[in-house]
Amino acid sequence: MLLNGKSFKIYDYDTQRTVIERIASVLRTIPKYLWYVNDAGNTKYTEEPNFIEETPNSITVINVILDIETQLLQSLSEFESRYSDWFIQSGNTGNSTEEESKEDLLKWFVIDFIRKNKNEGISEEHSILLLEEELKEGVGGREFDLNFPKKIWSDRSQIEKDYNKNVKENRTLSAQNEKRFKDLDKMPKASEEFSKFVVEKIKVSFTVTNYQTSMLSLFNIIDINKVEDSENSLFRIVTVTTANFFKINGLIDISEYKRIDPSQLIENSSSCIDNVLNIIIMNEPKQKREGKQSKRPEFIDITVKPNNESLLIEFDLSISIYNSEEDRNILKNYLIETLFPQNLGENLGENLGENLGGSQSLTPRFPEGKRRSQFPELKVGPTLENKVKGSYYIINRYFQKEIFLDMIMNDPDFSILYVDERFKVSKQQSRLYVYFVTTKTGVVAFSLLNQVILTENDPLFKIKTPDGKKLKVKVGTQYIKIRISSIENKLNIPFFQDHLNRLFSLYFKKYNSILQFYNLYIKITPGGLGIQDQQDINLNIDEPRINVPPRKKIGENTLAAQVPELFLPLYSRKCARAPRIVSEEEALELNQNNFQTIRFPIHSEGNLEPKIYACDHHKEHPYPGLKPNDLANKDTFKYLPCCYKTNPEHKRGSPYGNYYKGEALTKDMTDHELYKTPRIVPNKVFGILPTSIAKIFGKISQREIDEENDTTNYYRYGTMYGINSFIDAVARAIGNNQFENIYNERQTYISEIRKKMASESYIGLSRQETYDLNIEVVKKWIKSDQYFDPKRFLKIVEDYFDVTIFLFERNVGESIISKQEDDNFTITIDQISETVQKYGSGGQLSLPIHSTIGSYILRPLKNNIVFIYIHMGSEVDKVLYPQCETIIKYVTEQEPGRKKGTVKSLFHKHDHEVEVIKTLFDKLLLSYTSIMSGPNIPFTYEPINMILKDGYGLVLKEQFIDKSGKTRMLYASWVPKSSKTTLKEMLNEPAYFTIVTEPIHPLRLPIKQNKNKNENENLCIPLTDFHSLKTPIANHFEISPITNALVDDLMKIYNLNYKKASFKDYLCNASDYLKGQINGIKVRIYVSNSIEEMRRNDSTLLKYNKQRKISRILFEYVLYKFSQYIKSHNEYSKKEIFETFLLEKCLVDNSFIYKINQNFNVPFFTLFDNMFMVDSKIIFSSQNLMIRIMYNIYQLTVRKFNKVKELSNQTIMNTYFENLSDFNHNDNFFIVYGLNTFLRFVSETKQGELLLNTLQPFDGPRFFSSDDIEDGKIFSAFCYGSIDTAISNQLSDKDIDKTENGIIYIFDTINGYKAYQINYKGVKIVAFKVEDGDYYLTLKKTI
């Protein structure tokens, strides 16, 4: 290339950055001060030239700093005029904005201006004053502070010093790079054995001009459900993506999403950015392809993006499938018809039927000859094939991902490689995505993957060398697969292979040195297996290191081998971090480096010679100490050496202090009897917790349970074994220890407490957990002598003792089944043996039993908290039912109100432990979509009358509980709180009415049974038609409305809102109702005699979204009109243009209402003229709105005038599509936002996790199952908002069994699912209602 008329070499290893750095070095400046013009020197580039993709033959580049010095610029206006193109070029390059570039360059003009004037005898003060005056009044500098010249002149020495330093550093770096490039060119070819490149796919492309649309518009209008049925294949679109929006075809069977390879999505993740449209098409073959065992579909990735004045459409085709031009043209035809239906009109077949391989013009045809000028003649270019995808292999090698990434980031020789950290780097991905960039190849995207030949079907056995011989490989051979996913020209593949293999040769040479460096900090397992965690690696590089001898083989030179009398075989179980024995010399060296050592034994125990022990090899536990010995030699050796996290020398009363200093031992938990096995602990005995539970409470390792530095001891505390151990454990936790040492008396005492829990009000509390049991069964269970199950009766015990209880249990446990025969009630327990897991690992927070219908509602925390551990012991215990034990804290440090050495079993809700457990519990709940927190309900309970009162007059007497165990109706009376209550009012029965609630946890109230049920099983009653029932609605649902006399009182006291009736409110015959909250509960109370016609208003959210959309598109419309105004008034100054536009084109009309068409497929600016303009003036609905919009436009005009001016060339609005609600919607597809959301959809589908067992609206395909519908059979389901759409779509499914009767299952909160026959054969639908309307699930058998 010629640079300013002189030869400038561009090397194969050059990148865009290194070329620019070397050009700056030649011109003795730095890259940001380069000004690119063509060889004639008069046509300026609007941005930095791309030296990689389109290297110019000749270019002129100016050093703007030097240019300022040589130009005789007399004012800021001349400065701005001279360098206006450079400001644009610098802003478009991305290093800085136009404003920042102007300010940066302005400081050099200021320095040069004052310096030249000073040389001509003009004082510094006068020059600064001239510049300040021009900044105040002139065009060029009015965006800057008036003191700008004075500040720059005072800082000139530092500015010039920094600049010269940067120039010098750039020249040094450029010289190093040029030398390195020359050396790399001379590097011999790699000796690594690699296979030839195998082409797997070709990239086919064609262009479309006169398309008149944007990517978001294409996304909106694309016919995603269109099917192309050819002779050999069936083409269907799976997904369409742009700007991080994903449109997903809802008509494709959900199982097909399992076939989508997430790596393909990640590889093409650039399609998530703006201005690129990505389409995945599924090609389903109609017959088995040659060499294939099945008719599995192939997924084709299509990319659509602007390319100068045309639209470039690219897609990759497998050469083994699409080996004819006819196949490719069918796909091309399908794409054009799908993407541009508005351009083609009706007779698109006539336009596309011929000569698809060459150029063609496609004239749009519209009904009745009406042609739309927005959609001109569509021109489709010829089909081109120049890019390829494929793979080749490096044999008998593997690469370490972490080491290879290090070289890419830190080794200059690897500067032609880079990774895209936004999408490509992940610990979970074994494949590494890399980009190779040189001036010859442009950007090459490829991936690296370590593989091993496992079978003789491996592709390497099929590949031959250039001379026709098979590769020398066998089963077990390791190799690196290199897959090229994008390369501009397939002729550059040999160049890519040669240079990449040279880099691999460098990698293998440098591998060991880098691996050794990393092994100082992290453990890396060779073989590409990734980084392994290692707790005790020293991460402090400044800390002195001791050369530790390499590990010996097991049995050689171990502690047990060196001192067998002291270290018995079970020692390692007692001390997790053993010390090492060191010599006198090594001990001295360790002490000099601040490591401690101890001698043991020092009292001639066992006639042993004392040895020196050190713990320097444990980063986290460097202090040697002693621990109590309970092994077989404990009579000889009271203590054993061990390593600790803290210094035991400083802990008074520790085993260390006792042995070496003669201090008395401080009592600790070790003085209590302590069970360290999974067995059930006896009454009043302590036991350790499973590791995972202990860690939750703050323990680091279960092996440290009795270490002297342990200050957060949590244990399980035993109760008497029995059926009521749950009640016993909670009672002891709150301090009820009556008869705690007398078994029979304690059991009798606890049994009496249990009997009190069988009252009707307590039974109501348990209905969320006993939802699947008859109330009489629950009552008999509580009264029986069967096991009292914590996961069934948790809420009863919580209310009785006024505590909140957290349950913990083993990961393996039991299944409790109840059974009633005549008057006998029994339960059986299917136990899973706990010995199947190592005891130290199991344990978890536990949830009570609850229904899969709806949500499980949690109650707010009470003041006092109890932790209970449930388990079945070990096989040695051979128990019949689980045992409950209290989790306690052994206080080892003084706490408020509690002495050191005491046991704490009752916690407060603000204790640190409770906050930690509550946080973890909340995180656990996040994994259950059907669990939510309930409201705090401040009612006072009166046990004599079994009622709840709130103190304002509301009295709750009964509750209705639905099939899932949630309270949905409260039956209440109103007793006004007044001192003037008359005798007549006292004698009269108070008003009795029904409060319909949101699902809440059951209250301590009697349960009201629903006695009336609809017996007509053959009549399908749509949810919206309950008002047509011949009998009053109250006869069906036992809902009593309030009288009009109570309306005002309830509205005033509880701030309720009066709502007009809607026939959608099927619970109460379209009655008006009060809506709001009573004591934290969302309620609805129906009003008698107030039937009104339906009134549907937009929701607050919908109104908000509409206003947001109006605001953003109005702003862009005004900006577009202003840009047009600038174009037609070039003779005006910026200020004059703005002022005249405001006067001539803007008008405020407070009565004007904007009406936005939500269904524009392509939002041309001209379509909005009638919406925003009247008599050629833009209408603003308020003065404030006009001020806000015009202020922002003024700021843009001042800062980016040229860009604002260019907006007049646009025809399509950019901001029309911004939210999910802005696009067209249809029941046959759904739209999501974000790559992670879509990948989660794909991965969940792969794992079968889209199985719903709750009723809630959803988009796209799901699986659905309910125990109440055909015995829990799993169905494929779609959700619709219309019964007609649901029936129509199911009838169009050719796979439904039309010999079966049609059934609709209506779900209501009282009866659950009820089945009705309908006159549509094979149709199976579930109907349900949520807050925003009715929904219908179509069910299709999966087997």
UniProtKB/Swiss-Prot annotation:
Its main location: membrane. This is Uncharacterized protein 295L. It is found in: Membrane. Belongs to the IIV-6 295L family. It is a single-pass membrane protein. The chain crosses the membrane at residues 432-449. One of its GO terms (cellular component) is membrane.
